[in-house]
Amino acid sequence: MDKLENKSMANYDEYRAVVICASFSDCNQVLTTIKSIVCHNRFIKFYVINNDFPTEWFVSMQKKLAKLDCPIVNARVDASLVSNFKTDISYTVFLRYFVADFVEEEQALYLDCDIVVTRDLSEIFAVDLGSHPLVAVRDLGGEVYFGEQIFNSGVLLINVNYWRENDIAGQLIEMTDNLHDKVTQDDQSILNMFFENRWVELPFPYNCITLHTTFSDYEPEKGLYPPVIHYLPERKPWKEYTQSIYREVWWFYQGLDWSDIQEPVGALTQKMVEGEDDSSLSCLVYTYSCDLLHINYLIQALPSCHFYIAAPVVVAEPITRLLQYPNVSVSSDIAGIPALLESLEAKSQLLLDINAGDEVGDIIARFKSSGKPVFAFDSTVHGQQGQEVFPADNPEVMVQAIEKLGLAEPEERQISVLSIDQSLDYLLEKGASVVRFGDGEMDLIAGRGIPYQEYDPELSARLREMMAMESNERLMICLSDVFTGLERYSIDAQNFWKAHLQHHLADYLEICRAPWYGSTFISRPYIDLEDKTPSAGYFAKLKQLWQDKDLLIVEGLTSRSGVGNDLFDGARSIKRIICPSRNAYSKLEAIKQAVREHADNRLILTMLGPTAKVLVYDLVQEGYRALDIGHIDSEYEWFQMGASHKIKLSHKHTAEHNFDQDIEYRDDQAYDSQIVANLAQE
């Protein structure tokens, strides 16, 4: 087993092969897997290796997938394909052996049909297979239970050329014929025996087996899901009981209409799965017993409340019957799945202590320590643990209390943002660095790419982490000053921010818990202001930041900040590092190294979109001072023009004109002489 290396993450101009093997009895699962992939990816060529799918199914799928630039191939296996092999085993047992017989591409991603994909697959396809036959994720269950270093065969990146040239299918069929009755895990055992010490390891998130999360310290970025979720046979999400985490993710993709799948989404977010309205109440009953006092009455009296009923043992028929109600979920036999219980606790605002028999574990104490209420009847209460107790002969009283709990308005919390003046004064007084968060960064945090930066889960996680930080004398964290007083801005700006906050205010309130933030608008101090008279003072303070200082400007290829104006005339000297105008995050390490080589004691100014936030933060940890002041050049140009609206600049990048079209670069020897590194051309 070797460690993986990545190829260049270039844009794909060819199809990438995904292989699924199944019988038609699993067509609903195949459909769900395909929907999950095309929700986040384009230019995927699907090969469904099968022996019984109707032609009409493929005709229907071809029509749907063609609109998404994703063809599908009916890779049908029949007796003629295996006639040259001496075996008495049905070929349906080892359909995936035939990948190289159908796939035209050099590599193929094989996926079981009990899998959903929640992100762009580019990182997996970028793995360099070299001379290795396949890439896979280590099977943590095999390691924990049997001490075996094996891979799970549900996700395989296959070197198709290698398989074809070495007749891997023939060799695997021969081994299967000889050993099939001596192995415990069918073709997974055969594949591990055959490829022992010849496979490359892929990280756990790319085959996140729901039952194996207990054995891994991996946690997805907050608000997101693992890139590839794999549901094991005994606890499938399409069965009646909830017996694994991420069940709701499978049902989200299963329920997607094809009309819902338009532009690819970088990553599935919890908000997408749970919906915009997360105000509904949920409660948990955790029980050994099927005797739950007044449970039918409570469920019917509270149709807007969701009841999670869970048991560490297999539930009995009286519990199963409760699934007739749309506001009930049942989790059976979950004793060995702590992650599922934790998930149910997190979803529930209330614990109902209404079960006969013993309390399960310390569930009451766990809810109380989380600050969540526990309601009990006087005949079912388990000890005196701070429960709110209601009369068993009048369950309506408990219903009223639960309704009141659901109607309670959450405490209003305001996000405090300093004014532009206050923020600039802080930078001048403290000598702090600064990072600024705007609508583009929130889009990336929410799982969507923006015109000049593709979605990247690592970037998204880092942005979210920084947005939650408190400012200090070394680094000021800034937000857009739009949570109050929108009347300060132009009508267009007001409308934009109202729409933005309609979608993302809850995200800001969840993430941004620092006592105060600086203003992102320190570098946007003109065009969106209704009253533009203070702008001259703002620019004067900005210029004080670099007056008589040596500067290192880190910017995109088209930015050309300060070219053609006097914005940086007060600086002692200027050096520039030129970076890609798009997807600069892919060059982050190279950019940091270039900064180290040329920074000396210079003040670093960054104009590099979302990448600038991470760059500044990392540089501050290394002892540099850096200011993220993107868009400052466009704002200053408009200020000098006295513009009343956003005018496109002909000779360089213009804020909000994100595609950099029709730029006529002017020769500027001073600008050219300042460039000490050009990473945009590497």
UniProtKB/Swiss-Prot annotation:
Q: What happens when the gene is disrupted?
A: Alters carbohydrate composition of cell wall protein GspB, about 20% reduction in platelet binding by whole cells.
Q: Listed disulfide bonds for this chain?
A: none
Question: Cross-referenced Gene3D superfamilies, in alphabetical order?
Answer: Spore Coat Polysaccharide Biosynthesis Protein SpsA, Chain A
Which CDD domains does UniProt cross-reference here?
Answer: GT8_A4GalT_like
A single Gene Ontology MF term assigned here is: nucleotide binding
Positions annotated to bind Mn(2+)? 112, 114, 230
Among InterPro entries, the record links this protein to:
Glyco_trans_8, GNT1/Glycosyltrans_8, GT-D, Nucleotide-diphossugar_trans
Question: Where, in this chain's numbering, is UDP bound?
Answer: 21-26, 112-113, 230-236
Q: Which UniProt keywords apply?
A: Glycosyltransferase, Manganese, Metal-binding, Nucleotide-binding, Transferase
Pfam families to which the protein is assigned, alphabetical: Glyco_transf_8 (PF01501), GT-D (PF08759)
- What family does the entry list? Belongs to the glycosyltransferase 8 family.
Outline the subunit composition.
Answer: Part of the accessory SecA2/SecY2 protein translocation apparatus required to export cell wall protein GspB.
* Protein's job: Part of the accessory SecA2/SecY2 system specifically required to export GspB, a serine-rich repeat cell wall protein encoded upstream in the same operon.
Name of the protein this chain belongs to:
Probable glycosyl transferase Gly
Tell me which species this is from.
Streptococcus gordonii
